[in-house]
């Protein structure tokens, strides 16, 4: 089944992008997972990432790695829903937690940001160390989509690590996305949601690593947070240096791994014209439904899974391509 099959049509009562984005986080459905194996991956002398594995029971099962968005973790409903559907389809599924996220709170001396492609590489290498004869497919959601695309552009000479990649609603221009979230009326609703999660992560960091640079807890917006914590903690000269070096738009031209970008034209955080204004390699397939919001994609029709979660369906469908 091709990725273009079952084109997205929004639910008739959830038409606009903000509603799609909000409702995409509601009606969570069954997110109960079978037993998971936990891995703690050391990424530096004071930092560990928590990685969960859903075993398929099939030694020949293909591997899919899922990476969450900002404010999320392996426990986010969309990660668990998609992981379960992939597992039912027979995949071996890994769900990573970035620094300071989920069960990884307090296990790293600084929090993750939109440019931690080195961490993603270490997770990929760890998984392939467990299963050296297998290939891996990687799905990055939202901010992890930016990280994934950055990684692929940086590692253009190492395509054998990843068979293919999918970035879902990636904010490839971090500065622009930050300004939208921090400065616009439509963005502030979501900004406040993200900041609550970030402040919890910051408190866990300060409690576990006294004396290290930690968020003050007074940051009101994503932009404030990036200025006062993200950039200095990651040793960038300033926030513009962080945005410039970590925005995936600067790496798309160098990607050699077959890559799909799924991003709705009405995404409230990721402006659609950004993809037309940057150079993209021929390895990238851009899939841009007219509607869907930011990781919403609540469909008007039932998917083959019996729900209205078009994003879930597309990720699982994409994972199964070339394997039938």
Task: Please provide the spans of the model-predicted regions.
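Catalytic active-site module of serine/aspartate enzymes centered on a nucleophile-bearing elbow/loop
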Residues: 292-324
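Short amphipathic alpha-helix adjacent to the substrate-entry channel of hydrolases
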Residues: 78-95
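N-terminal cap/lid segment of alpha/beta-hydrolase-fold proteins
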Residues: 17-58
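Catalytic histidine neighborhood in serine/cysteine hydrolases
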Residues: 280-297
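Catalytic nucleophile-loop/oxyanion-hole region of alpha/beta-hydrolase
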Residues: 83-85, 99-137, 306
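Short beta-strand element of the alpha/beta-hydrolase
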Residues: 61-69
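Alpha/beta-hydrolase-fold enzymes
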Residues: 129-133, 137-233
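Short beta-strand/loop motif that positions the catalytic acidic residue
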Residues: 255, 261-263
């Amino acid at each position: 089944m091709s990725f273009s099959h079952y084109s997205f049509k929004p639910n008739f009562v959830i038409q606009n992008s903000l509603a799609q984005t909000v409702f995409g986080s509601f009606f969570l459905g069954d997110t109960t997972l079978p037993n998971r194996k936990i891995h703690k991956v050391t990424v530096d002398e004071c930092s560990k990432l928590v990685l969960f594995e859903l075993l398929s029971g099939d030694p020949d099962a293909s591997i899919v790695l899922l990476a969450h968005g900002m404010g999320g973790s392996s426990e986010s409903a969309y990660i668990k829903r998609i992981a379960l559907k992939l597992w039912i389809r027979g995949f071996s599924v890994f769900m990573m937690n970035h620094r300071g996220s989920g069960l990884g709170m307090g296990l790293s001396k600084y929090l993750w940001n939109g440019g931690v492609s080195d961490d993603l590489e270490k997770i990929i290498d760890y998984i392939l160390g467990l299963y050296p004869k297998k290939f891996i497919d990687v799905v990055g959601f939202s901010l992890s989509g930016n990280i994934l695309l950055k990684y692929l552009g940086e590692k253009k000479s190492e395509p054998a690590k990843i068979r293919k990649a999918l970035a879902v609603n990636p904010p490839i221009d971090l500065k622009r996305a930050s300004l939208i979230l921090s400065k616009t009326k439509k963005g502030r609703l979501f900004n406040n949601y993200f900041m609550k999660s970030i402040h919890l992560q910051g408190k866990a960091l300060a409690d576990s690593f006294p004396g290290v640079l930690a968020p003050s807890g007074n940051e009101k917006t994503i932009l404030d947070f990036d200025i006062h914590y993200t950039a200095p903690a990651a040793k960038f000269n300033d926030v513009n240096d962080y945005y410039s070096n970590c925005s995936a738009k600067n790496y798309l031209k160098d990607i050699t791994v077959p890559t799909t970008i799924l991003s709705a034209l009405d995404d409230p955080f990721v402006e659609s014209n950004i993809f037309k204004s940057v150079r993209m390699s021929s390895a990238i397939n851009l899939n841009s439904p007219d509607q869907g919001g930011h990781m919403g994609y609540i469909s008007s029709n039932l998917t083959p899974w019996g729900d209205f979660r078009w994003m879930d369906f597309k990720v699982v469908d994409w994972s199964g391509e070339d394997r039938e």
